[in-house]
């Protein structure tokens, strides 16, 4: 049996980083088309209202303009691959909207994909470790990480590291939701972080 990639030439196989850049660029193009579609709908609705053909109460019923129609009107071309990609993008967006809450609830209880233990570090050392940790997590496209900072029982004047970690995570551009797990998994001595998606809809 021939290997799955046997018919592929080596130069046709994109490195991961290049493939991700291409996907991000395509996603930006689709977002541009989506913005143009919405602008076209708004413009058509305003013109119809001015003509008296569309009462305000019926504005929501205005006909929708597809992404491909906007692309054809603007660029005057038709590409079957692009049409298929637009349809797939719309399907993924609907699926993501339906399942995002369900997926987030599931992710909240899932086991973290990486762990950083900050015990014994100063706040300055912890920030440096966190910088490296989040950079690696983003490169690996992780969705959930665990940061162990302790409860500060052995610190004079109360916990110092935990508040510092919280401020760092809240200000980090790639960090999303953060929360403490159940006591049996570390409780307030541990912070779980859901990372923001680095590649849209993927």
From Swiss-Prot:
Pfam families cross-referenced by the UniProt entry: Smr
Sequence intervals crossing the membrane: none
The domain of life for this entry's organism is Bacteria
List the protein's name.
Uncharacterized protein TP_0674
Q: Which organism is it from?
A: Treponema pallidum (strain Nichols)
In this chain the Smr domain maps to: 116-196
Q: Which InterPro entries match?
A: Smr_dom, Smr_dom_sf
Q: Which SMART domains match?
A: SMR (SM00463)
């Amino acid at each position: 049996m021939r290997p799955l990639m046997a018919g592929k030439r080596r130069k046709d196989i994109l490195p991961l980083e290049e493939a991700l850049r291409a996907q991000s660029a395509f996603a930006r193009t689709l977002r541009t088309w989506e913005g143009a579609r919405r602008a076209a709908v708004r413009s058509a609705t305003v013109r119809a209202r001015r003509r008296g053909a569309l009462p305000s109460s019926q504005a929501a019923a205005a006909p929708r303009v597809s992404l491909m129609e906007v692309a054809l009107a603007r660029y005057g071309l038709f590409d079957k691959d692009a049409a298929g990609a637009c349809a797939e993008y719309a399907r993924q967006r609907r699926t993501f909207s339906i399942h995002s809450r369900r997926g987030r609830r599931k992710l909240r209880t899932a086991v973290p994909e990486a762990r950083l233990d900050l015990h014994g570090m100063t706040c300055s050392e912890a920030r440096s470790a966190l910088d490296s940790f989040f950079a690696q997590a983003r490169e690996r496209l992780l969705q959930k990480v665990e940061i162990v900072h302790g409860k500060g029982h052995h610190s004079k004047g109360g916990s110092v590291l935990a508040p510092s970690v919280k401020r760092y995570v809240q200000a980090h551009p790639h960090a999303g939701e953060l929360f403490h797990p159940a006591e049996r998994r570390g409780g307030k001595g541990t912070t779980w972080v859901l990372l923001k998606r680095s590649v849209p809809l993927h």
